[in-house]
């Protein structure tokens, strides 16, 4: 198997296959669940809005694919600084049955100089998740822009108890970049804690996936790159990867994240 095909296979196993569109329906989520059961194996997770968790759980059971985790989003997509609302949304997501919660860090507050609200929000949301539900914190690196702010948001999130740090919501012009990945992965290495990394949005094909995988392996070691500590957040990437593996036709133009 070529290096590109190996990267494609790996990226599928590390993928949070995502639909977070305003026009999502139960039918679209059922289709997403079916797509997550790929000819190359199951994706690590699906990522959907909270209200669709019950139908997704039912569908994954019917597909005999209960190993696929269900991730959802809270404080999404704007990263507001209202801790109470973020916590209530996170509790509701856990009550719905989420295995993982991707919460948006209050990045605009950080840009305005407030480091406290981000820490308190992440800490409270992790408490709402408990030990059994992973908390991934979306720092929105493409809006923070400044490497110092990307580093600071990563440090605050990890110090507050994040299980993962994630680049992006996929709802802003700039999503995952290798520059942001380098900073975020370096912070994880410095913190020396079992914290994962999730590039999301903008990873379009196996070659791009390979670059992110290579960056993670260089900074944290080849053995570190597993579904417990590395995920790709993507919607259009899957069809490109299956094409690379010669398991599907070429995608008809990238749609979405």
UniProtKB/Swiss-Prot annotation:
Q: What class of enzyme is it?
A: lyase
What Enzyme Commission number does this protein have?
4.1.2.4
What's a single GO MF annotation on this record? deoxyribose-phosphate aldolase activity
Q: Which GO terms describe its cellular component?
A: cytoplasm
Q: In which pathway does it act?
A: Carbohydrate degradation; 2-deoxy-D-ribose 1-phosphate degradation; D-glyceraldehyde 3-phosphate and acetaldehyde from 2-deoxy-alpha-D-ribose 1-phosphate: step 2/2
Identify the catalytic residues: 102 (proton donor/acceptor), 166 (schiff-base intermediate with acetaldehyde), 198 (proton donor/acceptor)
Query: Any keyword Lyase?
Result: yes
**Where does this chain mainly localize?**
cytoplasm
The record ties this protein, via InterPro entries, to: Aldolase_TIM, DeoC, DeoC/FbaB/LacD_aldolase, DeoC_typeII
So what family is this one in? Belongs to the DeoC/FbaB aldolase family. DeoC type 2 subfamily.
Q: What is this protein called?
A: Deoxyribose-phosphate aldolase
Origin organism of this chain? Shewanella amazonensis (strain ATCC BAA-1098 / SB2B)
Upper taxonomic lineage: Bacteria, Pseudomonadati, Pseudomonadota, Gammaproteobacteria, Alteromonadales
